[in-house]
């Protein structure tokens, strides 16, 4: 619950690489260049979400940058936060942000930091602060939640470049980090675009548009309850029960699995079926006796699994022969290979139209449940076996292409996330302004030097009787 190091020790450790400074710079305590105001303990009985009174910033609002809490009680002086004010959460992760919403009151466990801009550049301060907060957080012990004291903030030794250099660094960081954020935002949109692409591929696959060479092929209309789809006229129509191996009928699995048995038989549950696949890495295990009672629901290679309780419509395919059973919330479909290609059935069940049908066909009991009777009667389009194989080939080819792009995007995102840290570290080592310093020696020397700035700050403090920057508290 307490901070375990001094600011000097943090700087020596420099665990996040953001506490370095250029050898021409100095350091100064935060309370020498900023005023810290602790939040007030406003009565929670006066809080409301009806917009009665004035907005109030609670610690949960720091990262959001806005609040839905209002305070209707008496307002003491000195606890207002205005747009562009810097606030810090004093519990948990010690987050800092620039407040961009309407004026609001400062509640307890949030502090406001007002930079004395004749001594320190506000934007430079904002870029520097998170690295120190992160280091403080890493060196703060806790039983439940970590707490940050304003005394720790006051004593934090910040980098002190010349004022002109602070301004240049802040401007460079504003530009570079905005570019990083823009790049990151564009990259983060791509997985959603790829998701829509995959859905479009599935929709095209199950309506013949992926394989028909003549794009003006003749279609016929099929009605699925409230939905209508067009499929090629030369495709057959059937129901799910007609394409299931009669020796292994549609079924659900183990109703009461009992305890997790170390040397038992593995069991596939809803949580093990995601993104079209069955994850076999973390299966729970049931006793061999219970498994024997449910021999009917054992799985084999190429079985299709559908979740039918809770999260309706997750589809998975068993890729290998394994000694595994399924849970009550999972249905097993064993395709008749002479009629349907297992992966084509997987594609059909995963398609947007069937996913909608599965969800809307489920009934709300204690939890959403899809009855096996309804599932048996689900419509299935039937191209020729040859065309099914070709559909599967093309879908897998396009999905592999999308997967490759997604992997590249994830790698790029990882590099972009590291880029912010790298840029900040370079900035505070003075590397972003090396050329600027060489071109502007007069702005970093003499009366414009970091040493002169430090002496000026000390002199002003001495003239005011050694009084430190105010720290309001109640």
Swiss-Prot record:
GO terms in the biological process aspect are: DNA restriction-modification system
What extra comment accompanies this record?
Answer: Type I restriction and modification enzymes are complex, multifunctional systems which require ATP, S-adenosyl methionine and Mg(2+) as cofactors and, in addition to their endonucleolytic and methylase activities, are potent DNA-dependent ATPases.
Lineage here is:
Bacteria, Pseudomonadati, Pseudomonadota, Gammaproteobacteria, Enterobacterales
Sorted alphabetically, which SUPFAM superfamilies does this protein's record hold?
DNA methylase specificity domain
Write out the entry's keywords from A to Z.
Answer: DNA-binding, Restriction system
Organism of provenance: Escherichia coli
**What family is this protein classified in?**
Belongs to the type-I restriction system S methylase family.
Pfam annotation, one family: Methylase_S
- What GO molecular functions are on record for this protein? DNA binding
Q: How does it assemble?
A: The type I restriction/modification system is composed of three polypeptides R, M and S. The restriction enzyme has stoichiometry R(2)M(2)S(1) while the methyltransferase is M(2)S(1).
User: Domain of life, per the record?
Assistant: Bacteria
Q: What is known of its domains?
A: Contains two DNA recognition domains, each specifying recognition of one of the two defined components of the target sequence.
Function according to Swiss-Prot or TrEMBL: The specificity (S) subunit of a type I restriction enzyme; this subunit dictates DNA sequence specificity. In the presence of the R subunit the complex can also act as an endonuclease, binding to the same target sequence but cutting the DNA some distance from this site. Whether the DNA is cut or modified depends on the methylation state of the target sequence. When the target site is unmodified, the DNA is cut.
DNA-binding is among the record's keywords: yes
> Can you say what this protein is called?
Type I restriction enzyme EcoBI specificity subunit
